[in-house]
């Protein structure tokens, strides 16, 4: 059975992610982590979905069945789990969340003892254990070897201190009015607390989770609400998080949504000017606009590209010795601060940039114009390997000769193919996209 997608295990709660499957997955993960165990503790956190209770209990049952002691810390951002796993010296951390997805979905993300997301090889090992019923049965423990579980509710303070310490000590948020959208998700407590303790005037919305309203017409996927409130309250900036707070969307004082690539560009140059950008380089994904690459090049900053997914961004960052990277979608990684995308840590760096510049958000966060880019998602019945599709290279050749950049890939979680085209001339991009769509309608 295939379990892992592009970001952990994810699916409809009670269907793909039912209690029995989760319990088996927990046992398999526990068996895997015990091979390298030092403390025999695993940390478990979750976002605010109703199904989190069911999945949490199934995880605890599976982990304790193979001898692990479990620490449950309740609703916390995904990056907090990554940080606390290492800070509390656990063998692993587990986050129950489907990020920006609706409440019906849920997911499970695993972190190693250093707070890093598991790589594909580790995930495959867990899948192999999951599918080996004899091994699963033989590793079950009895008597005094069965693990324990306890709930700790005060670890939120550790994460708050860690994130606040990433903000320059000589700066304050006093005088800044901020609209914060918590998406009725995991940051509903910690988000406002951090900004208020640093002195900001915070107007918080969507901070009343009820188990069903996470990401519902709010948060990073629906920043238009924040946009309207920024204008209404004459705020200096708007910040929209997603359900597990690993993603950030920024809205400037005019109510305009800041593009993710512009944000990466502005932050890269800021970090370089502060002598905080290792190797004068940044990592973005294959989805990022080439205008970002050209802008960074003008500022003598190298850009490396990774596959889509913040764990792949981090892999390239480690490989190249780089401490900053992110995705167009709002996952931004400051590896000196956090081991994964962290919406709140990113927000503080954006605010530091604005304060130090002495300029308004709109003047500093949009340093370049994006090249025309079209992303089209097509449903497919079968994911035929691209290299096996007859005629594809012939279709792409004239497109590339016009100087257009193409990216064609299948979705990791849905039966869809994603077609991305980008170039300096909008009409060329539009015409080429129609050609591609027509081709794939016949080919797939």
Curated annotation (Swiss-Prot):
InterPro entries: A-D-PHexomutase_a/b/a-I (IPR005844), A-D-PHexomutase_a/b/a-I/II/III (IPR016055), A-D-PHexomutase_a/b/a-II (IPR005845), A-D-PHexomutase_a/b/a-III (IPR005846), A-D-PHexomutase_C (IPR005843), A-D-PHexomutase_C_sf (IPR036900), A-D-PHexomutase_CS (IPR016066), Alpha-D-phosphohexomutase_SF (IPR005841). Its EC number is 5.4.2.10. Its cofactor is Mg(2+). It holds the Pfam family PGM_PMM_I. It catalyses: alpha-D-glucosamine 1-phosphate = D-glucosamine 6-phosphate. One of its GO terms (biological process) is carbohydrate metabolic process. One of its GO terms (molecular function) is magnesium ion binding. It comes from the Bacteria. Mg(2+) binds at residues 99, 242, 244, 246. Catalyzes the conversion of glucosamine-6-phosphate to glucosamine-1-phosphate. Belongs to the phosphohexose mutase family. This is Phosphoglucosamine mutase. The gene is glmM.
């Amino acid at each position: 059975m295939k379990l892992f997608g592009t970001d952990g295990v994810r699916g409809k709660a009670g269907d793909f992610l039912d209690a029995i499957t989760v319990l088996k997955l927990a046992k398999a993960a526990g068996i895997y982590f015990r091979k390298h165990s030092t403390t025999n503790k695993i940390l478990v956190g979750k976002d605010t979905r109703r199904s989190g209770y069911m999945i949490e209990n199934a995880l605890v049952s599976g982990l304790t069945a193979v001898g692990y002691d479990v620490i449950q810390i309740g609703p916390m951002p995904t990056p907090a789990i990554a940080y606390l796993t290492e800070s509390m010296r656990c063998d692993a951390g587990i986050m129950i969340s489907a990020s920006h997805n609706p409440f019906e979905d849920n997911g499970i993300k695993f972190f190693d003892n250093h707070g890093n997301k598991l790589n594909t090889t580790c995930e495959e090992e867990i899948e192999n254990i999951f599918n080996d019923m004899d091994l699963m049965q033989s590793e079950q423990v009895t008597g005094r070897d069965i693990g324990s579980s306890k709930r700790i509710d005060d670890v939120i303070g550790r994460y708050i201190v860690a994130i606040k310490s990433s903000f320059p000590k000589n700066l304050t948020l006093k005088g800044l009015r901020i609209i914060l959208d918590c998406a009725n998700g995991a940051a509903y407590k910690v988000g406002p607390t951090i900004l208020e303790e640093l002195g900001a005037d915070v107007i918080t919305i969507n901070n009343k989770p009820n188990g069903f309203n996470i990401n519902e017409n709010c948060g990073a996927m629906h920043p238009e609400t924040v946009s309207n409130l920024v204008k209404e309250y004459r705020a200096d900036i708007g910040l929209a998080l997603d359900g597990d707070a690993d993603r950030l969307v920024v809205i400037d004082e005019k109510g305009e949504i800041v593009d993710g690539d512009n944000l990466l560009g502005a932050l890269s140059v800021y970090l370089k000017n502060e002598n905080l950008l290792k190797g004068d380089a940044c990592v973005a994904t294959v989805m990022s606009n080439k205008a970002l690459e050209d802008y960074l090049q003008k500022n003598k900053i190298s850009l490396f590209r990774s596959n889509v997914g913040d764990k792949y961004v981090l892999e390239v960052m480690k490989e190249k010795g780089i401490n900053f990277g992110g995705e167009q979608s709002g996952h931004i990684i400051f590896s000196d601060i956090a081991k994964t995308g962290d919406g709140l840590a990113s927000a503080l760096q954006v605010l530091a940039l604005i304060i130090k510049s002495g300029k308004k958000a709109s003047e500093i966060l949009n340093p370049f114009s994006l090249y025309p880019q079209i992303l089209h998602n097509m449903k497919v019945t079968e994911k035929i390997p691209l290299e096996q599709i007859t005629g594809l290279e012939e279709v792409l050749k004239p497109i590339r000769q016009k100087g257009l950049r193409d990216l064609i890939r299948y979705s990791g979680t849905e039966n869809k193919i994603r077609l991305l085209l980008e170039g300096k001339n909008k009409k060329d991009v539009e015409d080429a996209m129609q050609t591609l769509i027509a081709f794939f309608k016949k080919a797939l």
